[in-house]
Amino acid sequence: MEIHLFNEIGKVTDGPFMVHVALSTYRFDLGQIDMLFIRSVFLHNKHISCWIRIPFNIRNVDVDLHRYFSFKPKRKNERTIILARPVVFFSLPLLSPGIDNNKLAVEAMCICRFVNTNGAEFFDLEFMYEDILREFPDVGDECIKEDDHVDDFFTLGACSSATVGTVQNSTGQDHRSPVNDNNEHTVTPGPLEPPSVVRGVDSNSGNGLNNMTPGKCNGYPTGKHVWKAIDIYRLQPLHTPSDNVYRVLYDKSSFLKPRISQPPYDGLASCFFLRHEVYRFMRVIGTEIIDKFFDVMNSEDGILFQKFLCHVPMNALDISIPEMVYLSQNVWTSHVDPRSCIIKGVVAHLFKNPRRPCFVGSLTENEYWVDVIDIRQNRIYYGQKIKLAVDQETNLLTCNDKSRRYEQRAGLSVLYINTDLCCIWSFTGGFAVEFRLTLEDIGNVDLIRAVFGAPSTLFE
């Protein structure tokens, strides 16, 4: 995510300070979004603000940031920064409404939700407000001015405004100690003698300032440890001729192989309590689904019945049914995701009342949300919508769309759920187990309502 920002926060007098955003990501198909909402989450009291719809613009072109900002790079050989198409442009208020004295809420998180209403899909981008204005030390830049350079207090060298020792005379004679010379008036008096060993530091090494690398300050990151925040990765600051600064921040998903970064201070990961609560909910409901599955299996003495109308493929025996059950459940539980059919099914159940809109679309009769689990590729196709029918002759389930008869393909397992929380877990050959969830199995219902509830403007 590229957030470019003028550093004129002190000049703001009226209203919120707007941050202009250019977003490109591989995590979500931005070309299909038709609505954008933002909300604030306050970490100190866990208050969640209402969703606010904001305008945006989509361009299906690659964007050169240097041309977009109309300025030249600092160096001739500096590589250009290209945002891959499609790119979404929008602006969001940096200062959240309702904050006293219109000050920045440093303990607040911004959630941007990109919605595809046609596909009932959405993508959340989360970042801390304070991360936008956090001071990033520029690695390799001069952090200490020449006039402010400090020598070791006990090193006898040329005097400056902050050092003591002997003075080099104008004729180029050798340095002489003030103890052996009568030029006391030409030197700044220092201590009578240096200490010996204080707190494990030998006097010969002084206080270590002479060993400092020129141009770097203690306590700042080195070139190998650039500051990073969760989901946001800083590339570099961009300076314009008018001294306006643009902060360039990358969403972690912009990289094909996202970097795994550590938070800059303890507890940052725990600040994202909303996301953690969602994943905790998913782990709970995932465990319930596995338990329900085996409860039915035990009641049937371990027998799997064919519930889908299909032929058993010839290569289905490459993976036995018991192995397929274990592998499919292992793949699904290890890749649990908010896009899962289980989340969509639970949300559709909680918001069945049309007066209570949500970001997940409703289901018609005999429609299911499904997760297609590819065991061989260790991959899941989340939250697809499919409509099942009942064959009149065999009373088995079938799908009129032949391209979506997944049970006829070897190595695939499918998890179904509808708005009544009826679940079906099927395997190659149409063998399946049916079970049902309850509200008691779901757990934190209020969390799901808070996360997936939507403003009424979504359906206007």
Swiss-Prot record:
GO terms for biological process: chromosome organization. Residues 173-184 have a biased composition (Basic and acidic residues). Its main location: virion. The keyword tRNA-binding does not apply. GO terms for cellular component: host cell nucleus; viral capsid. It is found in: Virion; Host nucleus. Residues 167-197 are annotated as: Disordered. Keywords: Capsid protein, Host nucleus, Late protein, Viral genome packaging, Viral release from host cell, Virion. Belongs to the herpesviridae CVC1 protein family. Capsid vertex-specific component that plays a role during viral DNA encapsidation, assuring correct genome cleavage and presumably stabilizing capsids that contain full-length viral genomes. Interacts (via C-terminus) with capsid vertex component 2/CVC2. This is Capsid vertex component 1. It comes from Elephantid herpesvirus 1 (isolate Asian elephant/Berlin/Kiba/1998). The gene is CVC1.
